[in-house]
Design a protein with these regions (language model features):
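Extracytoplasmic catalytic/substrate-binding loops of multi-pass membrane glycan-assembly enzymes
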Residues: 204-205
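Membrane-water interface segments at the C-terminal ends of transmembrane alpha-helices
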Residues: 1-26, 35-145, 169, 173-189, ...
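Glycine/proline-centered hinge or cleavage motifs at structural transition points of membrane proteins
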Residues: 158-159, 172
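Membrane-helix/interface signature in polytopic inner-membrane proteins
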Residues: 141-152, 162
Length: 251
């Protein structure tokens, strides 16, 4: 078991560790002074945050529905939610462009509304929401399932409405799961490349910039940008661990 554990850790840490230590401090400082890099990282963070906000608004009620209800076809619905995790991400980009094109009824509606998907921030946010939503829903659903339903039932038996019960019982007990879901959604969105490059090469987010610099200039110019993105993702996951740690003592 110890050997397997070491092997797993080595597989994960060796490539990433080598990438992190290879660029010099000078290279990293130079990258952080590069306006194009800063713009792409800022755009990535903004789009990931918007995707997480959308996931919070539309994903929370859906996660609660899945956590608290049994209905015919529930397993099918849960499988549909997981589809963005399973399919190759270039397919996601192609699928989104398909429904957003003028040949599709939805695309014509968007065109009349003046909403552009291809080559726009809106398109990037749509893609990031698509890939990040399953992580938010699954995380929050598990959090709601961990809350004893009897607490909600007692509140309702005492005359509390559904909304009041959710705000006073479910939300205070489930906020950690919701915050963890937001972080998971953002982390996943920050790493997305395959679907974004098809829908919106420009404006350029960080993963697309890394790809462009690698294809144009090689490892030397792409690695420092990649290291910055790795460190941002690492910070998010450290936050996630701190958020989840007290949860073991709850309920």
């Amino acid at each position: 078991m110890a050997l397997c554990s070491l092997l797993v850790i080595a597989i994960i840490t060796l490539p990433l560790g080598q990438m992190i230590v290879q660029p010099s401090i000078h290279d990293l400082v130079e990258v952080l002074q590069d306006k194009e890099v800063l713009r792409s990282i800022l755009l990535s963070m903004e789009c990931a945050a918007m995707a997480a906000l959308i996931a919070l608004v539309i994903g929370t009620p859906f996660a609660y529905l899945l956590a608290r209800n049994e209905f015919p076809g529930k397993k099918v619905v849960e499988s549909i939610v997981d589809i963005p995790i399973m399919i190759p991400h270039p397919i996601i980009g192609i699928a989104i462009l398909g429904v957003a094109s003028p040949d599709h009824v939805l695309g014509r509606i968007l065109e009349k509304m003046g909403i552009e998907i291809m080559g726009s921030v809106t398109g990037i946010v749509l893609v990031l929401t698509f890939v990040g939503l399953p992580f938010y829903i699954n995380t929050v659903k598990n959090g709601f399932e961990a809350i004893p339903e009897r607490l909600e039932n007692v509140a309702r038996s005492l005359g509390a409405s559904f909304g009041s019960t959710f705000l006073r019982i479910t939300l205070p007990l489930g906020w950690r799961a919701m915050l963890a879901g937001i972080i998971m959604c953002m982390a996943r969105a920050l790493s997305e490349f395959g679907a974004v490059i098809i829908v919106a090469y420009h404006p350029m987010i960080a993963p697309v910039l890394i790809y462009e610099r690698f294809t144009a200039y090689g490892l030397k110019y792409s690695q420092p940008v990649a290291v910055i993105l790795i460190l941002i993702s690492l910070i998010l996951f450290v936050l996630l661990r701190f958020i989840g740690k007290p949860g073991k003592k709850r309920l």
